Amino acid sequence: MSLAADNVLLVEEGRPATAEHPSAGPVYRCKYAKDGLLDLPTDIDSPWQFFSEAVKKYPNEQMLGQRVTTDSKVGPYTWITYKEAHDAAIRIGSAIRSRGVDPGHCCGIYGANCPEWIIAMEACMSQGITYVPLYDSLGVNAVEFIINHAEVSLVFVQEKTVSSILSCQKGCSSNLKTIVSFGEVSSTQKEEAKNQCVSLFSWNEFSLMGNLDEANLPRKRKTDICTIMYTSGTTGEPKGVILNNAAISVQVLSIDKMLEVTDRSCDTSDVFFSYLPLAHCYDQVMEIYFLSRGSSVGYWRGDIRYLMDDVQALKPTVFCGVPRVYDKLYAGIMQKISASGLIRKKLFDFAYNYKLGNMRKGFSQEEASPRLDRLMFDKIKEALGGRAHMLLSGAAPLPRHVEEFLRIIPASNLSQGYGLTESCGGSFTTLAGVFSMVGTVGVPMPTVEARLVSVPEMGYDAFSADVPRGEICLRGNSMFSGYHKRQDLTDQVLIDGWFHTGDIGEWQEDGSMKIIDRKKNIFKLSQGEYVAVENLENTYSRCPLIAQIWVYGNSFESFLVGVVVPDRKAIEDWAKLNYQSPNDFESLCQNLKAQKYFLDELNSTAKQYQLKGFEMLKAIHLEPNPFDIERDLITPTFKLKRPQLLQHYKGIVDQLYSEAKRSMA
């Protein structure tokens, strides 16, 4: 299959298999890198320059905003300017140096998204200090591991996390010497810190220890380590991904380039809503980009219950989400439309299908149905504050029906991407005006080249004349330098200059990439059938009755079972219709008739999407508690942690197999 030359360019022919290596397909890059991969200009050496230049251009523009709660009442967004944030970063950076942290040393940042997080990051950048984000959800053991592994001597922490960091001080006392709270600290905490031989400061105290002298800021180099980002992963200890100044800086330029060609470059009129974890590469690089353009960044309160309330208060122009959030947005809007009456529902369906048809013919978002946008869809856009002109999605593939909906309804451009911490965030992105890319993650970003490598054991052939499939491999200017202190792990994934992602992709004729599988998320049933479990979960998730699902099988069993978190309203509606006593949610999940109903509906969905017989579920457990980070069942980007899920539900899984075998006997 030849790929569309108007979207991607062939860089290098493929290579056949050898005794040591499987075959590898051709190398491609996107059309916006036709003269070579995007690289840094000679006058840019670090991300700090983006911020310092923005301060000169936009000193009085609103930069960082948050809502303050007083007497249980939340207020409007309050802002600090670029100049105020810059001065704070210079003072904090100076104070860090006064504690003996020198350029090249590591400084930790541990807490939820807030202005202080970004100021601490910029403070480190100003001094050439490597900042190490600590996930609020990693847990004390992982935090202790990272502090010791990265040799962090100073850490910034959220006010409510001070006690947590003090509790692990005993295990990292040889490294950690200074703790700085984003807010206040109590006298009791000060005393506890003193007893553990660590200095503890409030944000204001620490700021006063620094000065505003910019004359002696150290020189930065492109090859200096900017950050070490520890990925939570789904197994084992966290891995420290090394990203240097050049990788992050060129990724910022890459984002600007792709926004320019798919929508528009951002400017001082733009407002970005920050709620995805700042410790994760995706949101962090996006914020660095917006702050390079003089835009504003507003932070959520950190409570999922009030997420949409914060969106309404901020009215962002760019919304960066993950499939889980967009799924809920889609379900909420569709529920309101269904409840609006038959006539309104039919009018909506007509308008939706008319615009969908025009966009499939090649009309742009703006051209497809301007009158229907004003009459039908502009009101729906209010769900995201009414001003969003760009929606971005990452972390996992969007379900096709949700992606189509988001491209049509909010009258905003939607770009879905794919990337990893190792690729400094996005490595592929869809082109907003190319509707054929729905269901894919788009073309390579202008900083990277991509190829597929065959995976014979899974039946994926990167040389297939029909549809090339294989493991996605990347190389380029925004890639990581390796794993901190783990050359063994680096050598496993960096082979001949190519980073092996572990994700299985499929080239499309328009030059876009479709994620179809995960190399590690495949297992064989006892009769020899291979099961691509992530694909199955994505299919079963199309069933409107469920909120989350984990499918399990192994090579000793001939069939699959699952743990399902049901949609609460769906199971309560079923109870009313079937004269079952509603009781409480937990009791309904234990109801045998409810379990049978949900299993039948899931397998009906499986048949609808033509799953094979061995891919059908034979038994399920209805779980009232969502899979969450607190129990270590999902990652901060909502990916299932399969070993931990099996450990948590081992007894239930064994019971499901026993009961299913008895019923089949």
UniProtKB/Swiss-Prot annotation:
This protein's record includes keyword Transmembrane helix: no
Region (Fatty acid-binding): 496-520
Cofactor: Mg(2+)
Keyword ATP-binding found: yes
Tissue localization of expression: Expressed along the entire length of the stem, but expression was not entirely epidermal specific, with some expression found in internal cell layers as well. Was expressed in leave epidermal cells, flowers (sepals, petals, stamens, filaments and carpel), siliques and developing seeds. In roots, expression was detected in an internal cell layer, probably the endodermal layer.
Effect of disrupting the coding gene: Dwarf phenotype with smaller, wrinkled leaves and overall reduced vigor. Higher water loss rate and susceptibility to drought stress. Defective in the cuticular membrane. Strong resistance to virulent Botrytis cinerea and enhanced susceptibility to avirulent Pseudomonas syringae.
EC number of the protein: 6.2.1.3
A cellular-component GO term for this protein: endoplasmic reticulum
Record-linked Gene3D superfamilies: N-terminal domain of ligase-like
Annotated ATP binding sites: 228-239
GO biological process: cutin biosynthetic process; defense response to fungus; fatty acid metabolic process; lateral root formation
Taxonomic superkingdom: Eukaryota
Major place of residence: endoplasmic reticulum
Pathway assigned to this chain's UniProt record: Lipid metabolism; fatty acid metabolism
Chemical reaction(s) catalysed: a long-chain fatty acid + ATP + CoA = a long-chain fatty acyl-CoA + AMP + diphosphate
Family matches, as InterPro entries: AMP-binding_CS (IPR020845), AMP-dep_synth/lig_dom (IPR000873), ANL_N_sf (IPR042099), LC-FACS_euk (IPR045311)
One Pfam assignment: AMP-binding
Top EC class for this record: ligase
Induction: Positively regulated by WIN1.
Protein localization: Endoplasmic reticulum
Keywords, comma-separated and alphabetical: ATP-binding, Endoplasmic reticulum, Fatty acid metabolism, Ligase, Lipid metabolism, Magnesium, Nucleotide-binding
Function: Activation of long-chain fatty acids for both synthesis of cellular lipids, and degradation via beta-oxidation. Acts in the cutin pathway. Preferentially uses palmitate, palmitoleate, oleate and linoleate. Required for repression of lateral root formation through its role in cutin biosynthesis and subsequent aerial tissues permeability.
Protein name: Long chain acyl-CoA synthetase 2
Gene transcribed to yield this protein: LACS2
